Amino acid sequence: MARLLVFLLTALPMMAWAEPVHLRIQGSNTLGSALLPVLIRAELRAEHATQVQVHSAKADNESVITATRADGVDVQVDIAAHGSSTGFDALARGEADLIAASRPISDSEARQLQAFGDLRSPAAEHVIGLDGVAILVNPANPLSELSLDQIAQVFSGQVRRWEQLGVAGGDIHLYARDERSGTFETFRSRVLAPKQVNLAPTARRFEAGDRLAAQVAVDRQAIGFTGLSTLHGTKVLAVADGTAAALLPERTLVASEVYPLSRRLFLYLPTPPSPQAAALIDFIQSPAGQAIVAEQGFVSQQIVAQRVAPVANMPAQYRALAEHAQRLSVNLRFQPGSAALDSKATQDVQRVIEYLNQAGKPHRKAVLVAFGDPKDTPGRAALLSRLRGEAVRQALARGGIEVLEVAGLGDQMPVAGNEMEQGRLRNRRVEVWVY
């Protein structure tokens, strides 16, 4: 009996240690249909796992990944990619360890899920890449650009014929993502809600972006929207916000979130965190993980320096930077109504620190240029923008970076209209330039 007891006492911890690891990911189709399976396979292989396999599940837009870790433990990762909202719903039911979302958590969701921690905290909210909601038409369509106002008129049904937009084509056929999609929520909040209109009931709805794009590619009268990884032979229109120039969703413009329909791609890690989920996030945020994000058609957060062509109407200080320095491919933004960095900027500051150290430019080689939105009091916009720049300077200083200068340019050079709060938030930004 004593020997049996000793055996059980020693064997039970080993049995527990060898228990299979099971990770459940639910939410965004944009993330879960292709990107996450590739990232998970890469993370498992980086940890020297063997027999890494992807299996199709019984339902559409679901998959199962299995592997055996180097320590002999079996791993199973279940992915259900039915839309961002379904991920938060699954967490509420206790059916998810990690939430994939192509839009930020809403106020009501954050309140409902308080039992799982502050899901807006940097420890829980992880931006793993960027994307743009692209406006798609058939390749035969001669149209090249639309404003956000025009897009709202089209998708609400106020504009129903292509002739109303200056091109031939007859009736407009609308294609949209479904209600549970984070892509649709981004489109609704950025395009429809500011004009207080709803999606026309005639729109055809799709759970998956690749299927939507495939239909637009064969319908000469079509217009739709989807993420950058599922364009599939369609024509992408440039988008204008207010009086700003129309922009295509080019990688540099999405990386800096200047493109009007740029969006962040999130993973939400609830409390208590799953160790397997936390390890996956760490891998995705690494250079190897971010390289995969870019390979899969999204925009990574790896920082690069780029030249900006000087333009005559630039502020003199800004034009001098364009002539002699390079701008980094990141804009640092803030929590609403605050000079505190948002969750993405908190991560990006560390990337800027790493970039400047690796480039051999930690001391007095960086200039911060801060912008804001218009204020009633003269000079207040410039003051507030400088305060935001100082907040970034202090964050960089904690990482050993000595900034050469902080410039507050106030409400100059807006990248969005200031009529709506979301536009004002986009204009409150800090750029990093390097000599």
Kindly label every feature range from the protein language model:
Residues 19-155:
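N-terminal segment of the mature folded domain
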Residues 34-36, 121-203, 207, 213-217, ...:
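Extracytoplasmic ligand-binding site segments that recognize negatively charged/polar headgroups
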Residues 317-322, 327, 333-369, 393-398, ...:
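Periplasmic peptidoglycan-binding/anchoring modules of Gram-negative envelope and division proteins
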Residues 361-362, 371-435:
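Periplasmic OmpA-like peptidoglycan-binding domain that tethers envelope proteins to the cell wall
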Residues 117-137, 145, 147-167, 233-269, 283-304:
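Periplasmic-binding protein-like
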